[in-house]
């Protein structure tokens, strides 16, 4: 944390094909070891599969999937009087997007399809239909927050 003021957030440039900042952020989350070209090929390949199989605009399908993945509530550990409580808190909009992208990439990598392009395409299509592991993670997070609603007054 800086001593002088806040750090300015860098603005992400929209990707050249779909002109979407969210797609650029997905490319950045998918990227490993600075290999942006590989990440871009995977995402555009997955979008081609989505377009061929559903016939819908892949960016709209992706945005619908993100809407279904992004959490509204999460729990945060808070120490009160020697014991830790899981306190439910609302998720900030930028963190919602980050968590959604992180979960989408994480659970795409765990899928059983042959290539990463297929895995990502299937996970996006599943999430758009409110199924899949990333949506389940969001529901588990909400369930945890709901179960600990009694500790909401410890919010800070």
UniProtKB/Swiss-Prot annotation:
InterPro entries in alphabetical order: Ribosomal_uS7, Ribosomal_uS7_bac/org-type, Ribosomal_uS7_CS, Ribosomal_uS7_dom, Ribosomal_uS7_dom_sf
Recorded GO MF terms: rRNA binding; structural constituent of ribosome; tRNA binding
One GO location term (cellular component): small ribosomal subunit
Keywords tagged on the record: Ribonucleoprotein, Ribosomal protein, RNA-binding, rRNA-binding, tRNA-binding
Biological process per Gene Ontology, one example term: translation
Coiled-coil portions: none
Keyword hit for Ribonucleoprotein: yes
Domain of life, per lineage: Bacteria
Pfam family name, one: Ribosomal_S7
Description of how the protein assembles with itself and partners: Part of the 30S ribosomal subunit. Contacts proteins S9 and S11.
Database matches in PANTHER family: RIBOSOMAL PROTEIN S7
UniProt-listed NCBIfam families: rpsG_bact
Similarity remark: Belongs to the universal ribosomal protein uS7 family.
Role played: One of the primary rRNA binding proteins, it binds directly to 16S rRNA where it nucleates assembly of the head domain of the 30S subunit. Is located at the subunit interface close to the decoding center, probably blocks exit of the E-site tRNA.
Descriptive protein name: Small ribosomal subunit protein uS7
Organism: Levilactobacillus brevis (strain ATCC 367 / BCRC 12310 / CIP 105137 / JCM 1170 / LMG 11437 / NCIMB 947 / NCTC 947)
Recorded name of the encoding gene: rpsG
